[in-house]
């Protein structure tokens, strides 16, 4: 079987990297194409996944439109040469959709972002199936297939990931230390337009430093006062560090969910709220969401301090994680069954 992938965000690399390895090991032929954004290509290099760049994401709306149009044209040429049996893409604009229609080849999407309404409006008509977590809040119609998992469980499920203790040790941290990780996003995605998160970053850090060491992971440049806090490890080691983190605080939904599936409590400060984070908050108590633009930041700050006062926070996180893992599946295993069985065995692919 020949499978063509496209990614346009670093998180999509993590989503598909184990799937690609599994398919390659089973004798299938895969090809990765990339719309460059942030550290996407660096991650692919670090995981040894060959790729072909078909464009570079730009922050402006007009820049995105130009990039996407050019990428579709380039992908059409790539697909004609590669001759895929199936094409696979993550959340965002389904740029493989038009290619699939023109070549009469099926396109499937793995999506977890309900608020990307423009992307769904323009992309969904061209795709054949849209696979979403069971907690996804929107009904996308007959093309939608739900499964009991999160994207983050494709690469952080215990059958796929074992944290490396050498990463925190390289920063002078041991198991007893309190580490607080702040995550700031770039706000360049279309679904981020008009949204907001943490504004008083320096004030947060001054107060949080009373509890432990503070490090920052950021998609954007930091000011001179914040740059010394930037995380001094490569992006592919973020999850190793996140496993040993006491509290994760940030604007990014992906890192909030990554924290949850690793048993690290997370504060999510963003006016966007997806079904994944809502479930991780209401069912598992691992994420605290603060979407109110007027009061969210202040309420999140109080919640963060309250959690850090709890000496048993890490142990409680581990217990909550055990429940989460008992109710969710290994998403990479699920995706392998979907791809190999497409389209005949899609309905039963979620069986453990």
Question: For each predicted feature, which ranges?
Answer:
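A donor-sugar binding/catalytic signature common to diverse glycosyltransferases
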Residues: 88-91, 96, 241-280
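C-terminal amphipathic helix plus adjacent low-complexity
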Residues: 309-352
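Catalytic donor nucleotide-activated moiety binding site of glycosyltransferases and closely related
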Residues: 47-51, 57-58, 182, 203-235
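Structural loop-to-beta junction motif characteristic of Rossmann-like glycosyltransferase folds
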Residues: 49, 105-106, 247, 263-267, ...
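A nucleotide-sugar donor-handling region in carbohydrate enzymes
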Residues: 131-196
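Donor nucleotide-activated moiety binding/catalytic core segment of transferases
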Residues: 71-75, 220-255
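Catalytic binding pocket for nucleotide-activated donors in carbohydrate/polymer assembly enzymes
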Residues: 261-319
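Active-site and donor-binding regions of nucleotide-sugar-utilizing enzymes
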Residues: 6-15, 21-22, 36-45, 50-141
């Amino acid at each position: 079987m020949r499978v063509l992938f496209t990614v346009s965000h670093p998180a999509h690399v993590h989503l598909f990297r184990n799937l690609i390895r599994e398919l390659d090991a089973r004798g299938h032929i895969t090809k990765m194409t990339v719309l460059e954004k942030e550290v996407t290509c660096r991650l692919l290099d670090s995981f040894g996944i060959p790729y072909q760049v078909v464009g570079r994401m730009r922050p402006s709306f007009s820049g995105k439109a130009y990039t996407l149009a050019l990428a579709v044209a380039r992908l059409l040429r790539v697909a004609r040469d590669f001759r895929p049996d199936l094409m696979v893409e993550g959340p965002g604009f389904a740029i493989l959709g038009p290619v699939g229609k023109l070549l009469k080849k099926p396109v499937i999407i793995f999506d977890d972002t309900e608020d990307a309404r423009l992307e769904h409006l323009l992309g969904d008509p061209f795709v054949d199936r849209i696979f979403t977590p069971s907690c996804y809040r929107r009904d996308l119609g007959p093309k939608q297939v739900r499964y009991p998992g999160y994207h983050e469980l494709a690469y952080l499920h215990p059958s796929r990931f074992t944290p490396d203790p050498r990463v925190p040790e390289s920063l002078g941290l041991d198991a007893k230390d309190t580490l607080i990780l702040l995550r700031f996003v770039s706000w360049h995605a279309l679904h981020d337009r008009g949204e907001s998160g943490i504004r008083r970053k320096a004030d947060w850090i001054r107060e949080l430093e009373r509890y432990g060491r503070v490090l920052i992971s950021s998609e954007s440049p930091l000011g001179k006062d914040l740059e010394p806090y930037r995380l001094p490890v490569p992006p592919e080691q973020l999850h190793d560090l996140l496993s040993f983190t006491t509290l994760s605080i940030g604007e990014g939904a992906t890192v909030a969910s990554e924290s949850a599936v690793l048993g690290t409590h997370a504060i999510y400060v963003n006016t966007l709220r997806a079904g994944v984070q809502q479930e991780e908050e209401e069912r598992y108590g691992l994420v605290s969401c603060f979407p109110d633009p007027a009061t969210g930041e202040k309420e999140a700050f109080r919640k963060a301090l309250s959690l850090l006062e709890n000496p048993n926070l890490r142990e409680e996180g581990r217990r909550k994680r055990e429940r989460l893992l008992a109710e969710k599946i290994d998403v990479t295993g699920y995706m392998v069954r979907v791809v190999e069985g497409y389209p005949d065995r899609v309905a039963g692919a979620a069986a453990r």
